[in-house]
């Protein structure tokens, strides 16, 4: 099987969401889903709001990134999470 690298864009619900705590939660979530977190970064958006990007490495399988994306969207302090880049290694 091939290895997949995905870049997931995560939008927090508000600027008050603690950035470092959110990053740590996302890392733990990725690892609980049998994947590796290859990096977490953030970029400022506007008015104190920021976007978090998570790089995920996993083996290609049925359903792909759907379980991880759904789990991220289910987090209390996450407005949205979506895969913005996907490539095979």
Curated annotation (Swiss-Prot):
Gene3D superfamilies linked: 3.30.70.60
Superkingdom classification of source: Archaea
UniProt-listed SMART domains: EF1_GNE
Molecular-function GO terms, alphabetical: translation elongation factor activity
Keywords, ordered alphabetically: Elongation factor, Protein biosynthesis
Keyword Transferase in record: no
S-S bridge residues: none
A Pfam family matched in the record: EF1_GNE
InterPro entries: eEF-1beta-like_sf, EF1B_bsu/dsu_GNE, Transl_elong_EF1B/ribsomal_bS6, Transl_elong_EF1B_B_arc
Family: Belongs to the EF-1-beta/EF-1-delta family.
Summary of the function given for this chain in its UniProt record: Promotes the exchange of GDP for GTP in EF-1-alpha/GDP, thus allowing the regeneration of EF-1-alpha/GTP that could then be used to form the ternary complex EF-1-alpha/GTP/AAtRNA.
Name used for this protein in its record: Elongation factor 1-beta
Species the sequence originates in: Methanococcus maripaludis (strain C6 / ATCC BAA-1332)
Taxonomic classification: Archaea, Methanobacteriati, Methanobacteriota, Methanomada group, Methanococci
């Amino acid at each position: 099987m091939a290895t997949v690298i995905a870049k997931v864009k995560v939008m927090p619900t508000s600027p008050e969401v603690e950035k470092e705590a959110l990053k740590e939660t996302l890392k733990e979530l990725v690892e609980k889903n049998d994947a590796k977190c290859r990096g977490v970064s953030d970029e400022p958006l506007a008015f104190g709001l920021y976007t978090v990007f998570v790089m995920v490495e996993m083996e290609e399988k049925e359903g792909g990134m759907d379980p991880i994306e759904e789990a991220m969207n289910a987090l209390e302090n996450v407005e949205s999470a979506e895969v913005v880049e996907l490539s095979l290694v």
